[in-house]
UniProtKB/Swiss-Prot annotation:
Changing R335W: In allele CYP2C9*11. The gene is CYP2C9. Its cofactor is heme. This is Cytochrome P450 2C9. It is an enzyme of class 1 (oxidoreductase). It comes from Homo sapiens.
Amino acid sequence: MDSLVVLVLCLSCLLLLSLWRQSSGRGKLPPGPTPLPVIGNILQIGIKDISKSLTNLSKVYGPVFTLYFGLKPIVVLHGYEAVKEALIDLGEEFSGRGIFPLAERANRGFGIVFSNGKKWKEIRRFSLMTLRNFGMGKRSIEDRVQEEARCLVEELRKTKASPCDPTFILGCAPCNVICSIIFHKRFDYKDQQFLNLMEKLNENIKILSSPWIQICNNFSPIIDYFPGTHNKLLKNVAFMKSYILEKVKEHQESMDMNNPQDFIDCFLMKMEKEKHNQPSEFTIESLENTAVDLFGAGTETTSTTLRYALLLLLKHPEVTAKVQEEIERVIGRNRSPCMQDRSHMPYTDAVVHEVQRYIDLLPTSLPHAVTCDIKFRNYLIPKGTTILISLTSVLHDNKEFPNPEMFDPHHFLDEGGNFKKSKYFMPFSAGKRICVGEALAGMELFLFLTSILQNFNLKSLVDPKNLDTTPVVNGFASVPPFYQLCFIPV
């Protein structure tokens, strides 16, 4: 009986604490739906499609509103004006990374994606500088992407125009580009180590996009005490870190300090320079996690976009025909596509942009946080508050993009057929937390897609009208449904 009384008292205290925290903070924060004790607004949000729920709530509470995930307040920004004001106009104040408990377990605050403060700034600055020195957006990395595009075309030829699921092959190409940047090595598509790495990356994007992960991140005790797919994700990350550590040891034994070959060499050189400046942010643990982040951000996002792009091109054969006509006119058949071609191919450029806009790969991006107490639109948001960005509300804005739910390359073309930029184009987020590999991803999408369409016609196994382009999961990332196609050599 005594234990029951204690339990009831504990629960009562928890409920009172929950109510007090919510009521004391709500006077400062933007308005929002009334949260339930302990669980907050979790029942009012469709976990399978958070973005749709945010759109519905914005119609009631406006472009800036507050939700509670458990006891934790989260300020939501919906629509271009609110997102721009926060991420661009007040970029420094909104540059923090929001709480992501599962990532905390995986990387302990290291790396480039989930770190904060001085650690994040130094690692991000170093990573950007190193990638630029190796030619991100310049010639040397373009050579690597072109080489991988040629290998991709050869792998597709091996399908002999038979029906195939493109998931694996389209994942190999961007993964190999990242391998060449980090390890100075590309792998054969049949290499077992490479296959294991690909498998872990593919599993992780599916797990991260599941409703279960949303629950884990908002009720963090689940991570330590409950079984579930989150444990598989943590094991996959541990596998990748151990693999990278092996490569780091190989580099330490063979590195030429006067001739760095890749990202690992550059990081080890930085560690050597910083060894007298303790404590340094440049450690082996930081290198492991930064490399894992580059793999995660640079492989599955690009391969998922490529997979979605081919599905949309199957669905819209008239678009595919126009792209192939432009390829034939500008590039021809006797040389590989290059980035200089893009400025002469406005329709193809528009298609690449429209694919990214339409699929809305990361509907709410990753959570941000404010780095200080900030007054925002007459609300006071306390330091450390998590900020949720609705990228969907920007990419699918119906004023900027008429009929935003329709796939239409003319969203990025003017009346004369010239490519038209849009400030609403934010597939990689915006501001200080914009994806480090934005330029690389854009290069890969253009070169891989043009190389495929230069060499193959795409054949659907069903009537294009019957192809479903609805994402199968739409949590962290929008993942396309399973499909097969035939690559018919031109």
